[in-house]
């Protein structure tokens, strides 16, 4: 199957891919995948919550929203040294990228210098850096880039026409605007969504269509399977057919051939066999470590054993990322623009 990079996909084309027999869809996705990646290599990231809980948003899936009683206790922003210690552990375990997440609607300008210090120190360990901090304005995005940030994660979560069923405190366009700010300063984008929230296949098509028709495909596309947390509105939602999840991975791979397609939240509940199908469908990235922000993730030893059984190996740093212009000196700590989106 052709792996020409396209930005003009249609909903009809994506529906046609979803409607293929699963063996045929897997074959097409694997063919595209092999044109751009070594199928035996998996990029490994670790995600750390550097500021947990207390988020003012109402995302129906999120245990960190302060309005839901989920047992998550709000915490302050971690100290830089503690974050660096976690990053060292992640590197020793085989991670090549370290992502720092904060439960904010958007960061305050006063928080940016400390985040910038985290980025510089983690970068100095030889790791790629990623951050997910909520909505950014252009000035904040530039400050993070100047600190050496490689990737910024900001998911669109779902399709535009299902979005209002899940979130009311932030508009879909707000998410697209943040992605534009991130692209404008030259940061790489990490953007995906969540499935299993009660959406239909049409909504899953809409999510992938949004991603595949962005001005530039996300460099990383995290595909999350809903982790149902007691106390959140989506707790008790009917679970998604595992084969439908595999189809989601395969269509993401076909429509965004050069993107890293990441198995993200929900992997704890997946069998080894289901994960293998996802790798065959074009997934080539995972989150490593026992926790993803506040939810469980497979233990490192389990992932290492799975890699060994399947003959997979961790991917080394991507050259086009590690050779980016990096500034390890002074960061723009005193941000020129003072309004926060």
From Swiss-Prot:
Pfam families per UniProt: BATS, Radical_SAM
Residue stretches making up the Radical SAM core domain: 40-267
Names of the cofactor(s): [4Fe-4S] cluster; [2Fe-2S] cluster
Positions of [4Fe-4S] cluster binding: 55, 59, 62
Cofactor: record remark: Binds 1 [4Fe-4S] cluster. The cluster is coordinated with 3 cysteines and an exchangeable S-adenosyl-L-methionine. Binds 1 [2Fe-2S] cluster. The cluster is coordinated with 3 cysteines and 1 arginine.
Reaction(s) catalysed by this chain's protein: (4R,5S)-dethiobiotin + (sulfur carrier)-SH + 2 reduced [2Fe-2S]-[ferredoxin] + 2 S-adenosyl-L-methionine = (sulfur carrier)-H + biotin + 2 5'-deoxyadenosine + 2 L-methionine + 2 oxidized [2Fe-2S]-[ferredoxin]
Top-level taxon: Bacteria
Keywords: 2Fe-2S, 4Fe-4S, Biotin biosynthesis, Iron, Iron-sulfur, Metal-binding, S-adenosyl-L-methionine, Transferase
Pathway: Cofactor biosynthesis; biotin biosynthesis; biotin from 7,8-diaminononanoate: step 2/2
InterPro entries registered for this protein in UniProt: Aldolase_TIM, BATS_dom, Biotin_synth/BioAB, Biotin_synthase, Elp3/MiaA/NifB-like_rSAM, rSAM
Gene Ontology BP term (one): biotin biosynthetic process
Coiled coil: none
Subunit structure: Homodimer.
Role according to the record: Catalyzes the conversion of dethiobiotin (DTB) to biotin by the insertion of a sulfur atom into dethiobiotin via a radical-based mechanism.
Protein family (similarity comment): Belongs to the radical SAM superfamily. Biotin synthase family.
Record protein name field: Biotin synthase
Organism: Xylella fastidiosa (strain M12)
Gene: bioB
């Amino acid at each position: 199957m052709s792996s020409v990079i396209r930005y003009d996909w249609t909903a009809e084309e994506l529906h046609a891919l979803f409607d293929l027999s699963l063996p045929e869809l897997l074959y097409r996705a694997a063919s595209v995948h092999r044109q751009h990646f070594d199928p035996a290599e998996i990029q490994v990231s670790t995600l750390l919550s550097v500021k947990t809980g207390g988020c003012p948003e109402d995302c129906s899936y999120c245990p960190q929203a302060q309005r839901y009683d989920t047992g998550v206790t709000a915490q302050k922003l971690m100290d830089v040294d503690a974050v660096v210690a976690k990053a060292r552990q992640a590197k020793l375990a085989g991670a090549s990228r370290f992502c720092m997440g904060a439960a904010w609607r958007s960061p305050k300008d006063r928080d940016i210098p400390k985040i910038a210090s985290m980025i510089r120190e983690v970068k100095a360990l030889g790791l790629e850096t990623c951050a997910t901090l909520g909505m950014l304005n252009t000035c904040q995005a530039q400050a993070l880039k100047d600190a050496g940030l490689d990737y910024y994660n900001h998911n669109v979560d779902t399709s535009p026409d299902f979005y209002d069923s899940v979130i009311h405190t932030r508009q879909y366009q707000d998410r697209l605007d943040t992605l534009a700010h991130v692209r404008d300063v030259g940061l790489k984008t990490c953007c995906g969504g969540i499935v299993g929230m009660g959406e239909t296949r049409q909504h899953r098509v809409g999510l992938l269509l949004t991603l595949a028709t962005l001005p530039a495909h996300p460099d990383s596309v995290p595909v999350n399977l809903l982790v149902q947390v007691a106390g959140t509105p989506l707790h008790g939602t009917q679970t998604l057919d595992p084969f439908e999840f595999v189809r989601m991975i395969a269509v993401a791979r076909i429509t965004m051939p050069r993107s890293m397609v990441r198995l993200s939240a929900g992997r704890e509940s997946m069998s080894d066999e289901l994960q293998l199908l996802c790798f065959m469908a074009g997934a080539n990235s995972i989150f490593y470590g026992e926790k993803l922000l506040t939810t469980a993730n497979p233990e490192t030893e389990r992932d290492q054993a799975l890699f060994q059984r399947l003959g997979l190996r961790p991917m080394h740093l991507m050259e086009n990322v590690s050779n980016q212009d990096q500034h390890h000196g002074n960061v723009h700590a005193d941000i020129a623009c003072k309004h926060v989106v």
